[in-house]
Amino acid sequence: PNLKSRYLLGRRAAKRTDVAQKLIGEGKFDQVGYIAPLGKMPFSEQTQSSKEGLVSQMSKMKEVIEALKQDKTSLVAICGMPGVGKTFLAEQIADQVKFEKLFDEVAKANLSQIPNTRTVQDQLAEQLGLKISEETDRVRAERMYTRLSNGEKRILVILDDVQEEVDFKSLGIPVRGECKGLKVILTSRLSHVCSRMGAQIFEVGALPKEEARHLFKEVVGMSDDSTLSDVSDQVADECKGLPLAIIVVAKAFKSNHTTPESWNIALRQLKKYTMRDIEGVQDLVFSSIKWSYDHLESVEAKSLLLLCSLFPEDYSIPFECLVR
């Protein structure tokens, strides 16, 4: 893509938006119409092909939702190795419980490697419509606690990527039965950390072989009777059932390989990529991402990806930073 032309187009669009907003402000309109955004499709209404390819995830999702329905359960944890789909599963659960009207509100915060109490509170407060930006730590926690425990609404809080014990008191999150209307979901690769917090653990494992192959073909856009079906199954098997690896590799194959010969060459290359002794990085996840990086179409795309990797985890990267 031509980044310069995209940047210029974006600037023109921003200027025209400012002009439109000014005209709206100066006009005497009783109402200004906007196209309503499309809501997320609940998991139960997704396409049949997707559901067939995610049988194990749907089963796990139902288990977690059943636990959330129990009065005695206030804290659950979705645990598993990196790339297995913990965050995706938590988000699907959030969509489904809202669709079923089990909860009135859902708020999610990313904890990442170095969780900051105020940052986590700000993420939750924004989604809950709570203003706490100018308060002291103690007052912020009290206001968050009051918002979550007033009993007027059923609230689901998701804390993603937990790597150490969470100080719920400092955050202002009532747990362990303090509020019947509040439930908390943790996602973490460290089940022992979640166990120490008293969470009910739900382990998420790799996809069974047939589900993994189905997901790979679905991402590539390939039918079972394709001439590439056999080699695609071998590629999918190399991903060892990890959804992240499957999706990353499948997208790269979809873009760059169209013949059995090119697929076989790429398969041999994929088998060579390994990485060891880096905490929190599975060999397979790294090899899949490294392989897909090497198969990006241009040096410009590779440079952009490397630039993005310099920013902190979960950082919202301004577009302008990428085109300077």
Language-model regions, residue ranges each:
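Hydrophobic residues in beta-strands of the RecA-like P-loop NTPase core, especially within AAA+ ATPase
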Residues: 157-159
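N-terminal flanking helix/linker immediately upstream of nucleotide/cofactor-binding cores
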Residues: 19-84, 88-97, 101-105, 110-113, ...
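Conserved ATPase-coupling elements of RecA-like P-loop NTPase cores
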Residues: 163-171, 195-198
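P-loop NTPase nucleotide-binding module
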Residues: 1, 43-44, 50, 55-56, ...
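Proline-centered turn/helix-capping motifs that create local helix->coil transitions or kinks
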Residues: 21-35, 116, 175, 179-180, ...
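Amphipathic alpha-helices that form helix-helix packing interfaces
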Residues: 1, 6-16, 20-23, 27
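Alpha-helical sensor/transducer elements of the RecA-like P-loop NTPase core
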Residues: 118-127, 180-234, 248, 265, ...
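Structured beta-strand/turn binding interfaces of compact recognition modules in eukaryotic regulators
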Residues: 26, 79-81, 109-114, 162, ...
